[in-house]
Structure formats: structure tokens, C-alpha cells
């Protein structure tokens, strides 16, 4: 027998054995991944039978698994490439405003380090990344100045790199931060002029990035923005009045309503612009992201059940009802009367089809106690501005089972807004900065519990199409500074080194287990990969 024939036979056998070995290795990996599921950390909250039932759930093929961030909390580079001061740049420079006296001038330096951070996302297996744009980086002086092409070029590069990684950008126009110029010039959200500025800004973003961005949200948590900025004064522009806070100026009863109204009108203007000039060609979607709290009646009494409804009206539906139905919630209209701004006929015209989706940021739940027909303790909330509701995390010293709030909130939005598309745009767990904690079991337990609740809502019919973990990295956490850590990756803020926590491995395994691609298909894919062993 010729040597060439012998070598050919040996090569064929080797190839066959190698192919079989790949299949066996794939089986072993799949088994190990299944054994390393989240059930070992959360078997105290549901039975083993229920866990197995949950594990059979597979998300739709186009479901978005991702992580979320915001410009001010991540980017740093606060005066780089033509950017000027934002409201948060100015606010964090005021003594006593931030818990540890810190700021976001560097943050996690995502502006320069995002390519490496995209590698981390790719390793996790996510297929989407929720980020926000810095308004002050694109329009340093609002509509009163030129477009900063340094900012445009940066975001163009970043969006292109995100897409090259196989990840879908999910972009928010503003996540609390605005050019400080607009605050100096006319008082930002307290002035109707802000609508023109926001529409101008949205137009530039749609024009420069919309050919590649298929998911837009106008605002992130405008309810938090106006409550903390204009009622308690703990966020910029730090306006309030007693008894809500001790600010140098402001009106905690009226100004939140005015700011909210101008935000709603700005949202409607941006959506109308996108619908009429961009959506048909760009084929994207546009929505809004809200902070949500599930309010559970503290008792079965009618008064407390109605209080829970009022709590939602004065927190969530305050913004969503005008956008969807063209009017403020009935509970707000009954209590606030003429203090509540009115919508004109022209406003209502643009409110039709004003949402393709609602983004749900869900972290917590509260008990709601009636203060309209009952006496509440002084200093415990429950004012007219809050709908005469006292919201508390505890009942008889015990905390509400918070993961239930995810399921309840998703079903509430589904029923109230007629099966609208939903994305869980933020969900995560913060821990005090007590050193390098890499075995973050509490975060794993939190995420797995909430994701189980999300699955249950989907089984009941909620049209949930994505989940974004907050967050990939530890970052600047607003007035808490760097005292709280939310990252699946620990960040050493002195060196910017990223180190994976247990939650990063857990989330990676969760995505692998639950995406629509079956494990058999995944194994076949690996069998065909000629570089499978070169790792």
C-alpha cells in the first residue's frame, strides 16, 4: 500500500475521531452549563419543581439580551472633543451634593475604553447594548450654537463598532443630562422653549445615526428627573420648597408639573418628527423609558387599594397616559385640578401613535397606604403633590417580596396600554462599596428572581421583547457617587481595570440556556467551527 494512501486513511480516521470528540465535548459543556444554572443560588424562593418549569422557558429568537449604561455615568471625557458642561458637570461640582464628593469627569472612561467594554459584552453573549448620547457633546449650546462634529464622529465610530460586534444599539436621547447652557439661558424644563431645543437635538441624532440605530427612546426616567430635580431638589437643577427640601428657590408643588408637561410635549415633538421624516426610510422604533415601582396596597381595604392606584398615577401614568391617551390620569386631575397644565388640540394631534414601546426600569416595590381618608404620620409623605399616598418598603417590619413587582408591573402596563410592546430597559442590584467583592451571590439571586418574574409575565401574555441588566460595569451612581456598585464587572477606579464578578458568568450562562437557539443547534454550530479548539 502506498504511503499516500496510508496517510489518507489515517487522516480520515483522525478527522472522524476529532469530530466525535467535538460532539462529546459539546455535550459535556452543555451539561456543565446546565448544572451551573442559577437554581443553586435561589432555591429558597421557589420549589424545585417550579425551578425546573422555569428552566424550560426559551425566549423568542429576536429577544434582546443586553446591558445598559448612560453617558454621564460611563463616558468621562467631560470636556473632550468639543463637549461643554452639562447640568451634571455643574451640579457635581457643588459641595455636598454627592455622597463621596465625586463626579463623572472620568467615570469609567467609556469614551476611550468602549472597544474593550464591547469585547466584554461580546463575551457575555448579549445581542444589544442600551446607551445614551450626551446632548452637551453633540450640541454644546443647544440650538443656539453649531453642531459639534467631534461628538458626532465619536458616536458614529461607536455605533459602527457596536454593530461590527454583532450587537444592536438601543439609544436614549437624554438620560438626565442636558447642556448647562439651556439652564443658564431660560431655565431648561420650566420653559416651553425646551421643546424646540429637544426637537432640534432629536433631528440631528436621527439624521446622523438613524440609518443604523433601530431603537430610540426619547427620555430615561423623566418621572425621577422631575421629582428629584424640582420637588426634593436632590438632582439638578436643585429646585424645591419646604417641606420637601431646603433649596434656595423653587416650588415643589407646581414646578414638577410644569417640567413634566414640557418633557411630555418634547417627547411628542420628537416622535412626530421621527414619524413624519425618518421612520419610513430608517425603519426604526421609538419609545420612552420610565422608572417603575410596583405599589402594593398595605391592606385589603378599599382606601388602600385606591391609594395604590393613586401612587401609580402620580409616578408612572403621569407621563404615559398623556402620551397614549392624550390626558393626565383621572386621579391627578381630581386632586390637582387647575394646577395641572392642559393640553391643546395641537398637542393631542401629535399624541396619536406616540409610542412604539415602553421601556420599564424595574428595581423595587413599595407598600401604599392611604393618606386621603386616613391619618398619616407627619413627615411620612402623603402630601397632595404625592397623591395623598404614603409609600413604604416595609410592612410590620418585613420587606415586600420585590421580584413579584416585576411580573405585576409588566402585566399592569400590558393591560392599561393595550398589549403594547415592552422592554425591561434596566434591572440590577447595587451593593455598598466595601472592597473588591467578586462573589456577588446577592446580585445573582436578585437577577434570577426578577428574570423568573419576567418569564411568568411573558407566559401570561406580556409582549416583552428585551431585558437589559444594569449594569456591565461599576459606575458613577448619581448622588451616591462611587459608594454603590451595580456592575457585573468590578472596576478599580484608580486604574480602570475591569474584573468579572460571579454575576457575569451567571448572566452569560443564563443567556446561553434561554435563547431560542437549541443546545443541539449550538453544538452543531461548534462542530462546524474550524477554530473550535484554538481557544
UniProtKB/Swiss-Prot annotation:
One family name in Pfam for this protein: Glyco_hydro_1
GO BP terms, alphabetized: carbohydrate metabolic process
Signal peptide: 1-38
Reaction(s) catalysed (UniProt annotation): Hydrolysis of terminal, non-reducing beta-D-glucosyl residues with release of beta-D-glucose
Active site per UniProt: 221, 426
Enzyme class: hydrolase
Gene3D superfamilies found in the cross-reference section: Glycosidases
SUPFAM superfamilies: (Trans)glycosidases (SSF51445)
UniProt cross-references to InterPro entries, sorted A to Z: Glyco_hydro_1, Glyco_hydro_1_AS, Glyco_hydro_1_N_CS, Glycoside_hydrolase_SF
A single MF term (Gene Ontology): beta-glucosidase activity
Domain of life: Eukaryota
Keyword Transferase appears in the UniProt entry: no
PROSITE patterns linked to this entry: GLYCOSYL_HYDROL_F1_1 (PS00572), GLYCOSYL_HYDROL_F1_2 (PS00653)
List of glycosylated residues: 93, 246, 419, 432
EC id: 3.2.1.21
Keywords: Disulfide bond, Glycoprotein, Glycosidase, Hydrolase, Signal
Disulfide partners: 240-247, 371-376
Entry binding sites for a beta-D-glucoside: 73, 175, 220-221, 363, 426, 470, 477-478, 486
Protein family: Belongs to the glycosyl hydrolase 1 family.
Protein name: Beta-glucosidase 47
Amino acid at each position: 500500500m502506498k504511503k499516500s494512501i496510508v496517510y489518507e486513511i489515517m487522516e480520515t480516521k483522525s478527522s472522524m475521531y476529532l469530530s466525535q470528540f467535538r460532539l462529546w465535548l459539546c455535550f459535556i459543556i452543555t451539561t456543565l452549563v446546565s448544572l451551573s444554572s442559577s437554581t443553586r443560588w435561589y432555591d429558597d424562593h421557589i420549589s424545585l419543581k417550579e425551578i425546573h418549569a422555569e428552566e424550560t422557558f426559551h425566549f423568542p429568537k429576536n429577544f434582546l439580551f443586553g446591558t445598559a449604561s448612560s453617558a454621564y455615568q460611563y463616558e468621562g471625557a467631560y470636556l473632550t472633543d468639543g463637549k461643554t458642561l452639562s447640568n451634571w458637570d455643574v451640579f457635581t461640582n457643588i459641595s455636598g451634593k454627592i455622597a463621596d464628593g465625586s463626579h463623572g469627569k472620568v467615570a469609567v472612561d467609556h469614551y476611550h475604553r468602549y472597544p474593550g467594554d464591547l469585547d466584554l459584552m461580546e463575551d457575555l453573549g448579549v445581542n444589544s447594548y442600551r446607551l445614551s448620547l450626551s446632548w452637551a457633546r453633540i450640541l454644546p449650546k443647544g440650538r443656539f450654537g453649531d453642531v459639534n462634529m467631534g461628538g458626532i464622529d465619536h458616536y458614529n465610530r461607536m455605533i459602527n463598532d457596536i454593530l461590527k460586534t454583532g450587537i444592536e444599539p438601543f439609544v436614549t436621547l437624554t438620560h438626565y443630562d442636558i447642556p448647562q447652557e439651556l439652564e443658564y439661558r431660560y431655565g431648561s424644563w420650566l420653559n416651553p422653549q425646551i421643546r424646540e431645543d429637544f426637537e432640534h437635538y432629536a433631528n440631528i441624532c436621527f439624521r446622523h445615526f438613524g440609518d443604523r440605530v433601530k431603537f430610540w427612546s426619547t427620555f430615561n426616567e423623566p418621572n425621577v428627573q422631575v421629582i428629584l430635580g424640582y420637588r426634593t431638589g436632590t438632582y439638578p437643577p436643585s429646585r424645591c420648597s419646604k417641606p420637601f427640601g431646603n433649596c434656595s428657590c423653587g416650588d415643589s408643588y407646581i414646578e414638577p408639573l410644569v417640567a413634566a408637561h414640557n418633557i411630555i410635549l418634547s417627547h411628542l415633538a420628537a416622535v412626530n418628527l421621527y414619524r413624519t421624516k425618518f421612520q419610513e426610510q430608517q425603519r426604526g422604533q421609538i419609545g420612552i423609558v420610565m422608572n417603575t415601582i410596583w405599589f402594593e396596597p398595605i391592606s385589603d381595604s378599599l382606601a388602600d387599594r385606591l391609594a395604590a392606584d393613586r401612587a401609580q398615577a402620580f409616578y408612572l401614568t403621569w407621563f404615559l397616559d398623556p402620551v397614549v391617551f392624550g390626558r393626565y390620569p383621572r386621579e391627578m386631575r381630581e386632586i390637582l385640578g387647575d394646577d395641572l397644565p392642559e393640553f391643546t388640540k395641537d398637542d393631542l394631534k401629535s399624541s396619536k401613535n406616540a409610542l412604539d414601546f415602553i421601556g420599564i426600569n424595574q428595581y423595587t416595590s413599595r407598600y401604599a397606604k392611604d393618606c386621603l381618608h386616613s391619618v398619616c404620620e407627619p413627615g411620612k409623605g402623603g402630601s397632595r403633590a404625592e397623591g395623598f399616598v404614603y409609600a413604604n418598603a416595609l410592612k410590620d417590619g418585613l420587606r415586600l417580596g420585590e421580584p413579584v413587582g416585576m411580573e405585576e408591573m409588566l402585566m399592569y402596563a400590558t393591560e392599561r396600554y393595550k398589549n403594547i410592546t415592552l422592554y425591561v430597559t434596566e434591572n440590577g442590584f447595587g451593593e455598598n462599596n466595601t472592597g473588591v467583592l467578586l462573589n456577588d451571590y446577592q446580585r445573582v439571586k436578585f437577577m434570577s428572581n426578577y428574570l423568573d418574574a419576567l418569564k411568568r409575565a411573558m407566559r401570561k401574555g406580556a409582549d416583552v421583547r428585551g431585558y437589559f441588566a444594569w449594569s456591565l460595569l461599576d459606575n458613577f451612581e448619581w448622588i451616591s457617587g462611587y459608594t454603590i456598585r451595580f456592575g457585573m464587572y468590578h472596576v478599580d477606579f484608580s486604574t480602570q481595570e475591569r474584573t468579572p464578578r460571579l454575576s457575569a458568568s451567571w448572566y452569560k450562562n443564563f443567556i446561553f440556556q434561554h435563547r431560542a437557539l437549541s443546545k443541539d443547534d449550538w453544538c452543531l454550530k461548534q462542530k462546524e467551527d474550524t477554530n473550535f479548539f484554538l481557544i
